[in-house]
Amino acid sequence: MKYDIIGDIHGCFQEFQNLTEKLGYNWSSGLPIHPEQRKLAFVGDITDRGPHSLRMIEIVWELVIHKKEAYYAPGNHCNKLYRFFLGRNVTIAHGLETTVAEYEALPSHKQNIIKEKFITLYEQSPLYHILDEKKVIVCHAGIRQDYIGRRDKKVQTFVLYGDITGEKHADGSPVRRDWAQEYKGQAWIVYGHTPVKEPRFVNQTVNIDTGAVFGGKLTGLRYPEMETISVPSSLPFVAEKFRPIS
């Protein structure tokens, strides 16, 4: 099986459509379908900050749950939106406010449909996907080789948030260790979460979050070809979001 793994979309539907078309997908059915049966995989954070988060929920639900034509691994923004939909007490900030505003603008019956679709998508998707006979792992913020196969709380924190130190940057965002430099596993780890200006290959890992929602690019990785394809963002460039990885 061949896959096209898509970086953090964050509600940037137009960029997603442009990227999938560039990757050879046909949208005539209203969904991206590849003529050679390639499958899409998502590294999570499909919502928040961008203009079309609910549209992305609809599309990913349709592809993953209804048609079973794609793979989705949740990100930290997905986890927070899931908790919001469950009625938990979450802070509506750091991007969630844009998704909530879209949601609250809907009539109540449409709110219920979106809520149920996202809850189903989240609950029926694994923390990470092990694909192609364990040769590639699709996850949100990465995974250490000794964590592969585990799904306990410690691993969940790592996969959703990265290798956080407990310290904070001046803007409140967490300081993260560069776990990819220490990775010695054989499987390719394809992930996102931390915006980089260009896809970042380190050992057998590749970060494909090229900051679409911050005015960078939306990137897909063609697997097993290991070729990256990007399209430019239509949003303003926010330089401080592309912090050097420590």
Swiss-Prot record:
It catalyses: P(1),P(4)-bis(5'-guanosyl) tetraphosphate + H2O = GMP + GTP + 2 H(+). It comes from the Bacteria. The keyword Hydrolase applies. Pfam families: Metallophos (PF00149). Its EC number is 3.6.1.17. SUPFAM superfamilies: Metallo-dependent phosphatases. Keywords: Hydrolase, Nickel. Its cofactor is Ni(2+). CDD domains: MPP_Prp_like (cd07423). One of its GO terms (cellular component) is cytoplasm. One of its GO terms (molecular function) is phosphatase activity. Asymmetrically hydrolyzes Ap4p to yield AMP and ATP. PANTHER family: BIS(5'-NUCLEOSYL)-TETRAPHOSPHATASE PRPE [ASYMMETRICAL], METALLOPHOSPHOESTERASE. This is Bis(5'-nucleosyl)-tetraphosphatase PrpE [asymmetrical]. The lineage of its organism: Bacteria, Bacillati, Bacillota, Bacilli, Bacillales. The gene is prpE.
